[in-house]
Amino acid sequence: MKRQLKIAISCVFYVLGWPVSALAGVVGIEKKQRLVILYYHDIPAAIRARFARQMDKLMQRATVVGADWRGGAVKGRVCAITFDDAFVSVLDNALPELAKRRLPCTIFVPVGALGRPPGWTMETNYAPDDVVADQDLIKSLPSSLVTLGAHTLTHPFLSRLPRETARAEIEKSRTLLSAMTGQDVRLMSFPYGDYDHEVAAMCKTAGYDLVYGIVPTTVYPRDGEFIRGRVAVSPDDSDLEFFLKMSGGYWWMSLASTLKQACLSPHTFLMGKKQAPKRPPQGKVERWWSGLL
């Protein structure tokens, strides 16, 4: 029921976007270029065909770019594909399908868990025999297809750790992954999407260019935002569900998440411990409608 309700609300916001966008053009509000970032976890062999079907639909309806895309001469929908946790199933089942279609992706690696089953609570149902890719597999990934990003060392809730421990998770995961692969790792995703303002500041100091949460906020790549939101996707999503997600129809959930946190834990919200990315100030009308434009 909860899933169906999300689909219904997303349909409403997606349809509302048409007249709002038209009205914005009439009154002279510039339509900003948007990026929708999808994120997956594991891709078991049993659902590989469904993942491939989603990639076909994505190619038909959007231009696929890297998760670090800063904007450019692209018309229509723009999407990026990311994977958290660097599971072997992603390398075995997702990457061959992406390679066939020449679709780039970003994989976020928990460097302290290489070659082992996940020792953390999973956000989605995953194949029980899946493990994190080992060092040799990570090093073998083609840089023309895969951009690597850090996902800390041990996949903790960063905002709950002592500050120095959190700093070590952030800094060491970047330096170790860079040394292992020979790449200058500049991207990181937060485990569980958990961060606060201090954690975000640590990431900047550690040398990351962009970091990623799990709230489906609208990403405006030309605005120079440091924290980018993403929308969770599964090969089990229905065609309508996947279309709405890749089209940015789930952006309203960032508002719902912010309101829920403010109501349930006002002190935590005011202290800045939240998943929703912080953006530069905007006018009230523009802020409310920005996800529709």
Predicted regions mapped to residue ranges:
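Histidine-centered catalytic micro-motifs
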Residues: 38, 43, 147-156
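A short, conserved beta-to-alpha structural element at the edge of catalytic cores
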Residues: 102-124
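Acidic/aromatic-lined carbohydrate-recognition and catalytic surfaces
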Residues: 83-88, 94-97, 101, 110, ...
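Alpha-helix N-cap and loop-to-helix initiation/capping positions
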Residues: 125-129, 133, 161-168
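C-terminal active-site subregion of NodB/CE4 polysaccharide deacetylases
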Residues: 2-82, 88-89, 93, 160-293
